Amino acid sequence: MTISDSIKNILLLKNNNNKNNDNNKIENDNYDVIICSHKINSKNEEIPPTDDDTTTNGGGSLNKYVRKPTNQMCRENVEKTFKEDPILQFIIKEMMKLGCLPPVITCEPCDSLDALGSFTPKKGVIICDNMPTFPLNIRNTVVHEFVHAYDMCKNKLNPFNCEHLACTEIRAANLSGDCKWQLEALKKNFGVFNHQAECAKRRAIGSLQSNPNCKDVAEMAVNKVWEKCNKDYYPFSNIPRI
């Protein structure tokens, strides 16, 4: 089953339960700006390249989980996420209630060596297939980018407004599993207390710093929207567990 087949099956399932979507207008944005790029944004999150299928060094780090990047591995894990992940399926369901089709998703090489994925209104979600990674990271990247797509659908984000981007980055970090405690510990970002908030803020600032339009105001933009956006888990009632 291809990625597109997985999406089609989900759409058919959701449409059977929500016939009203047929009457909803699906809006297409006429610009192609990268809304957000999911990046490794600190040295503690770097994943070293490997020539082997798996690495076995670093018993207490992410190294032992890392796999050699291939397009097939990317596609298989993206398809698995679409078929099995209830969090992603719920986001898609809620997008369709708003009258938005989920974005197209593809696995392809990315120019940036620290990018895991990105979202643009026209091209959809791109998952980087040339970055050493591991299945859970691919899953989190897919959900992360779909949070951005949901926010674009619901809130009509302005891709040139750094505060808008800061808010969706905070939400994506919270809702995707990026800041799961076990992952943070493996990345050596230790901290028992308030680790979720610290991780979400760090990742949001890092993402904005990689955006040429926002790099000089990244921390200010995140701090300005922090109180509101860090408590915004919609369409969930709280941070979902993975």
UniProtKB/Swiss-Prot annotation:
Q: What class of enzyme is it?
A: hydrolase
- Enzyme Commission numbers on file: 3.4.24.-
Any one GO molecular function term:
metal ion binding
GO terms for biological process, alphabetical? mitochondrial protein processing; mitochondrial proton-transporting ATP synthase complex assembly
Q: Which residues bind a divalent metal cation?
A: H144, H148
What PROSITE patterns does the database record attribute to this sequence? ZINC_PROTEASE (PS00142)
Q: Name one Pfam family in it.
A: Peptidase_M76
Q: Name one GO cellular component term.
A: mitochondrion
Q: Active-site positions, per UniProt?
A: E145
Quote the InterPro entries the UniProt record gives. Answer: Peptidase_M76_ATP23
Q: Keyword annotations for this protein?
A: Hydrolase, Metal-binding, Metalloprotease, Protease
Q: Which family does it belong to?
A: Belongs to the peptidase M76 family.
PANTHER family to which the protein is assigned, alphabetical? MITOCHONDRIAL INNER MEMBRANE PROTEASE, MITOCHONDRIAL INNER MEMBRANE PROTEASE ATP23 HOMOLOG
Recorded protein name is Mitochondrial inner membrane protease ATP23 homolog
**What's the source species for this entry?**
Dictyostelium discoideum (Social amoeba)
